């Protein structure tokens, strides 16, 4: 029995449905329905999958990049010391799996090697830019696949760049400005003053102000801690005013009274790494790991990656608007690009055919000329051979005639000799 066709349902618009989203009514539920547990589901899934964090450390050799990372995560990542004698800047990539309580973190640390050690430092930033672009390109290629698996994809895009500023000098070096200007559109930059214990407190604030003034005057975009979150607005606002952070790294334990703390022992006293009166290490750790890790990740995707993706798609010929400022669908862009590529392939194919036919004609002409040359040479040799044969035949004929003449002369000579002998013999007989 055939099923009756279902009549399409007609949705009657309601006045409330036509209102804007900001005018949507909020209703109080009359009972418990369970969707208040959605946040717990998300947390449980995230904990099960684990978290990942990718940090880029840019700074001169021996400035304390490895020590600060060890201090941040309170562990020894066992990194070898780098040499000062590299011909060019390189990158060292190391991945670690860390666990705190039941939360797993896959940490990738990318450190510059040989940065600032070359005489010519103009292109020192290029390996960093190339690496950042390569991670964006890898993610874009995965995203453009027909059969993609972004859930299982190991995202290697850098979430934050800790830029280590040398404590010596009165402001930024030209290399610092050049590098940050070339990477600020590709990564979240947090500047830190390394080995801040080398600067007195009175000079430190002046140094910070000089750095920030130079960053602003050169148009370098630093990462700003978000202030749109009610829970962290006040804290992030105050932290934005403390940039760049003055940090000191140390994994050594020293005794302060009855307590054991991480710090550095000096003849004049003890510097405690986790004492906010001594340095900004705790502020950096809290901002980086406790408060803004997710925002760093989000900014990497929605800001830096989207900029790279947009530029790459424009280079590939994709656009959202047509020539008449009309929206263009992806299918239309694809068909137009496909037609353009087909026409280009056809033109190139015709050019190749024309070049091929031209080469064939040139080769045929060359073969004909070579064949004619060989034929002429053959005819010449044939003529020479015939002339030589005729000459030899003539010489043979002459020799045969000479031989015949000699034979005749020999025969006549023999006849004459026999006649003489006979005559002599007769003369002798008469005389007797």
Curated annotation (Swiss-Prot):
GO biological process annotation, one example: protein localization to perinuclear region of cytoplasm
Start and end residues of each stretch annotated as Disordered: 412-432
Chief location of this protein within or outside the cell: cytoplasm
UniProt region (G3 motif), positions on chain: 111-114
Residues the record lists as binding GTP: 59-66, 88, 114, 195-203, 249, 264
GO molecular function: GTP binding; GTPase activity; molecular adaptor activity
InterPro entries on file: G_SEPTIN_dom (IPR030379), P-loop_NTPase (IPR027417), Septin (IPR016491)
Positions of the Septin-type G domain: 49-315
UniProt biased composition (Polar residues): 412-422
Pfam families: Septin (PF00735)
Quaternary state and interactors: Septins polymerize into heterooligomeric protein complexes that form filaments, and can associate with cellular membranes, actin filaments and microtubules. GTPase activity is required for filament formation. Interacts with ACTN4. Interacts with SEPTIN9. Interacts (via C-terminus) with SEPTIN4.
Function: Filament-forming cytoskeletal GTPase. Involved in the migration of cortical neurons and the formation of neuron leading processes during embryonic development. Plays a role in sperm head formation during spermiogenesis, potentially via facilitating localization of ACTN4 to cell filaments.
Entry protein name: Septin-14
Gene of this entry: SEPTIN14
């Amino acid at each position: 029995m055939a099923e009756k066709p279902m009549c399409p349902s007609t949705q009657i618009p309601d006045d409330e449905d036509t209102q804007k989203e900001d005018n949507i009514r909020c209703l109080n539920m009359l009972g418990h329905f369970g969707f208040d547990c959605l946040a717990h589901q998300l947390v449980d899934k995230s904990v099960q999958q684990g978290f990942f964090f990718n940090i880029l450390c840019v700074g001169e050799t021996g400035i304390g990049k490895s020590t600060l990372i060890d201090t941040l995560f309170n562990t020894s990542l066992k990194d070898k010391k780098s040499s000062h004698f590299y011909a060019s800047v390189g990158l060292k990539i190391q991945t670690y799996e860390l666990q705190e309580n039941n939360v797993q973190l896959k940490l990738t640390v990318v450190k510059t090697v040989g940065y600032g050690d070359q005489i010519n430092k103009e292109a020192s930033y290029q390996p960093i830019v190339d690496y950042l672009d390569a991670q964006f390109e890898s993610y874009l290629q995965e995203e453009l696949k027909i059969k993609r698996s972004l859930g299982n994809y190991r995202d290697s895009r850098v979430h934050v760049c800790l830029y280590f500023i040398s404590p010596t000098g009165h402001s930024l070096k030209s290399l610092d400005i050049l590098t940050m200007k070339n990477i600020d559109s590709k990564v979240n930059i947090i500047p830190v003053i390394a080995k801040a214990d080398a600067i007195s407190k009175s000079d430190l604030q002046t140094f910070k102000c000089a750095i920030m003034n130079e960053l602003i005057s050169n148009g370098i975009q630093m990462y700003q801690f978000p202030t749109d979150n009610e829970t962290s607005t006040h804290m992030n606002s105050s932290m934005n005013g403390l940039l760049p952070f003055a940090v000191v790294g140390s994994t050594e334990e020293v005794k302060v009274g009855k307590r054991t703390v991480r710090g550095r022992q000096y003849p004049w006293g003890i510097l405690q790494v986790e004492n906010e009166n001594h340095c900004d290490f705790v502020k950096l750790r809290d901002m980086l790991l406790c408060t803004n890790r997710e925002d760093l990740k989000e900014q990497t995707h929605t800001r830096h990656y989207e900029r790279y993706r947009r530029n790459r798609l424009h280079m590939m010929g994709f656009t959202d608007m047509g020539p008449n400022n009309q929206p263009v669908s992806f299918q239309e862009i694809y068909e137009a690009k496909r037609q353009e590529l087909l026409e280009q392939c056809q033109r190139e194919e015709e050019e190749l055919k024309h070049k091929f036919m031209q080469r064939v004609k040139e080769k045929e002409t060359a073969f004909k000329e070579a064949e004619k040359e060989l034929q002429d040479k053959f005819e010449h040799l044939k003529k020479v051979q015939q002339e030589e044969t005729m000459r030899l035949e003539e010489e043979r004929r002459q020799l045969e005639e000479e031989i015949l003449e000699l034979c005749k002369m020999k025969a006549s000579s023999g006849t004459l000799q026999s006649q003489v002998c006979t005559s002599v013999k007769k003369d002798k007989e008469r005389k007797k």
